[in-house]
């Protein structure tokens, strides 16, 4: 057993060849060592294709807790299985979206690095969002943290200052958040009760408040009051929400990304009549994608 736990790839290979019973255990150990980048190259020992293929299939089917990630223009954010928040990327202009303090400004972090200032393990991150110049993190207890460039109020802190470290959005302390989304200059937060808060740039009405005004603090989207929202998504200049199988969109529609059959901007959420039985949606710079309950992409 000690060989399986800490043996070298060569020891593990010899073990698998000595006894067929140990082949699956040896293969698991080799895959884990390779996944942790320890021990160098660790090819699977030779054997019948059937058991190695079965093992690989089982690994692919196994639930994973660490697949929480988001991509901005020049950075990425991750949450591992233990709830640690990690980021990597390049912040040449010093916008703070990596969350490692001003000492990281003007440089690159090429390997995901934990954000120690967030206070893990007291704060465990379960969701992340990122866009060009800011990042959002959601903790297991429903708290929202924002950092990066604060222009237009997209961090929700009531000001436009740059935040070099993750800072809790105090205005949402009375809510239990379950989802976050980051757009070009705006942010969306979904609460446990199905409410949606938006803040940041109001360009083209993408905050959903019926106007084009910026919001420095989170504000509840009143047009969605009474609608049980299940998911939120932010494109660069538009926003999407999913509720009870319906999809709603608002903001800039110049490229048809709102799905309403026109190219107009919509200042408040409007249901997309062409979509039904929708499970989730995502927004890009000038397009939107929805997934229905049959697994079809639209």
Show the residue positions of the predicted features:
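Eukaryote-biased RCC1-like beta-propeller repeat architecture
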Residues: 1-298
């Amino acid at each position: 057993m000690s060989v399986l736990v800490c043996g070298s790839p060569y020891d593990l290979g010899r073990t698998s060849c000595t006894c067929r019973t140990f082949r699956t255990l040896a293969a698991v150990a080799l895959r884990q060592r390779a996944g942790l980048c320890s021990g160098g190259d660790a090819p699977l020992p030779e054997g019948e294709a059937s058991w190695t293929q079965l093992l690989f299939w089982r690994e692919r089917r196994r639930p994973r807790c660490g697949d929480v990630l988001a991509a901005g223009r020049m950075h990425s954010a991750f949450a591992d299985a233990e709830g640690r928040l990690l980021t990597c990327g390049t912040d040449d202009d010093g916008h703070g979206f990596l969350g490692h303090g001003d000492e990281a400004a003007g440089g690159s972090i090429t390997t995901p690095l934990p954000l120690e200032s967030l206070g893990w393990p007291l704060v465990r991150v379960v969701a992340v969002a990122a866009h060009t110049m800011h990042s959002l993190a959601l903790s297991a207890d429903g708290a929202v943290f924002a950092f990066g460039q604060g222009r237009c109020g997209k961090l929700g802190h009531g000001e436009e200052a740059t935040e070099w470290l993750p800072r809790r959005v105090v205005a949402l302390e009375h809510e239990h958040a379950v989802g976050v989304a980051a757009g070009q200059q705006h942010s969306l937060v979904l609460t446990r009760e199905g409410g949606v808060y938006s803040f940041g740039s109001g360009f083209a009405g993408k905050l959903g408040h019926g106007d084009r005004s910026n919001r420095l603090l989170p504000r509840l989207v009143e047009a969605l009051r009474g609608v049980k929202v299940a998911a939120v998504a932010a494109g660069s200049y538009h926003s999407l929400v999913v509720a009870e199988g319906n999809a709603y969109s608002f903001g800039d529609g110049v490229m048809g990304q709102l799905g309403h059959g026109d190219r107009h901007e919509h200042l408040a959420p409007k249901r997309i009549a062409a979509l039904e039985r929708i499970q989730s949606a995502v927004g890009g710079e000038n397009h939107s994608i929805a997934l229905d309950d049959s697994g079809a992409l639209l």
